[in-house]
Every structure is written in structure tokens, then in C-alpha cells.
Amino acid sequence: MDKNDLVQKAKLAEQAERYDDMAGAMKSVTEQGGELSNEERNLLSVAYKNVVGARRSSWRVISSIEQKTEGNEKKQAMAKEYREKIETELQDICNDVLGLLDKYLIANATAAESKVFYLKMKGDYYRYLSEVAAGDAKKTTVDNSQQAYQDAFDISKKEMQPTHPIRLGLALNFSVFFYEILNNPEKACTLAKTAFDEAIAELDTLNEDSYKDSTLIMQLLKGHLTLWTSENQGDEGETGEGEN
């Protein structure tokens, strides 16, 4: 199918909230090679974020049920089997995205903004893998996630304004990684606070087009800081809702 037709198909699928179809169309666009436009890049990101998000949410629900059914072997075995099925789906989706990133997207990215966007995405999808991994696999996915986030972070600090929504979104997700995956609230808070303060100091550089995106992410950073620094930290799972 022609690239423009695939993009149109992805937009239709998004309107219909059929995100698996949307992801399939954007995967085909990516596999045609060449650099994606901003619009195409965002369509790809939205599609897979919804596809993987549904599985992450399901996995958390079933994991919780599995823990609550201790003492009832049959129920627990059924929950475990179902969790593993969801886990496999989640891993396949993440590996799909990581394959596209390594084979096409990161390699073809020329602008700093694109490189940061894709490296952040790489960090995100290794983070999602690490949430369901154990043992050596967990260590590998955590290390890969941190490396991708760090690479993106270094480029963003050099090449992008502190108010840029992609730089802010990266800081948000990297701080969530430190809090939830590395259990390092101190580092998470420092990173989020620095990103927020640097953006506040340069509010006059806010781009009119991205004003809404930037201020929304700044609010999320502030919300996380409040949650993480309060004595009653609540349920850590709540943090994930404020990802970019």
C-alpha cells in the first residue's frame, strides 16, 4: 500500500479507536524506510502507546488478582496462566517497537529532536519490558532502558530548550524510571525538579505551537514531585498514569 494511504488508514483507525490496526499501518509506513515526518512519528507513538498501554493495564489487574488468590491453587493457576498470556503479548509488542527503532527510526533520524524522541521511546519500551521481567532478563531490560534514556537526556540538554515538550516528556519518563524501576526516589525528585525549574526559568522561550504540551508536562512533573515528596506516598502505581 502507498505510504499516504497507510497514513490515512492509521488516522481512520485512530478515530475508530482501533489501535492495533493503527499500529499495523504505521509499522508498514516505518518499514518503507526513510525518515518519518512529525505527524507520522506522532501517529506511530500514539498507536503503540495505546496498544501496549492496554496490556500493561491488564497485566497489573491480573497480577493483583493472582496475589489475592493465594490459598486457592486452581484460581491462582488460572490467573498465572492468563497473566503469562498477557505478558507474551506485551513482550511481542515491545520487541516490535524496539525492532523498528533500532532498524529504521534511530538510524534514519537526522534532527536532534527526532533522535531524542526515538531514544526516549526506546527507554520507554525497555522499561515496559522490565516491568514484567525477572532475573537476568530484568537486569538487561533495566540497563537498556537507562542507557537509552541517558543518551536521549544528554542530547536534549545540549540541543533543545528546557521548555521543549519532548525534552520535558523525557525528563518526566526518566524520573518515573528512577522512582518505579530503580526505587530511587531521591534521583527521581532531583531530575523532575531540575527539569521543572529550568523550564520555569525560561518560560519566555515557550513556543506558541507547543505551549499546551509543555505546560501540561510541567504540571505532571509538579504533580509527581508533590506525590513523591509527600510523607504519604500512596500507591506507587499511580505514578504511571502521568507518563508522557
Swiss-Prot record:
The modification N-acetylmethionine is found at M1. GO terms for cellular component: cytoplasm. Keywords: Acetylation, Cytoplasm. Induction: Repressed under stress conditions such as netting. InterPro entries: 14-3-3, 14-3-3_CS, 14-3-3_dom_sf, 14-3-3_domain. Expressed in brain, gill, heart, intestine, kidney, liver, ovary, skeletal muscle, spleen and testis. The record marks R56, R127 as: Interaction with phosphoserine on interacting protein. It is found in: Cytoplasm. Belongs to the 14-3-3 family. Homodimer, and heterodimer with other family members. Adapter protein implicated in the regulation of a large spectrum of both general and specialized signaling pathways. Binds to a large number of partners, usually by recognition of a phosphoserine or phosphothreonine motif. Binding generally results in the modulation of the activity of the binding partner. This is 14-3-3 protein beta/alpha-2.
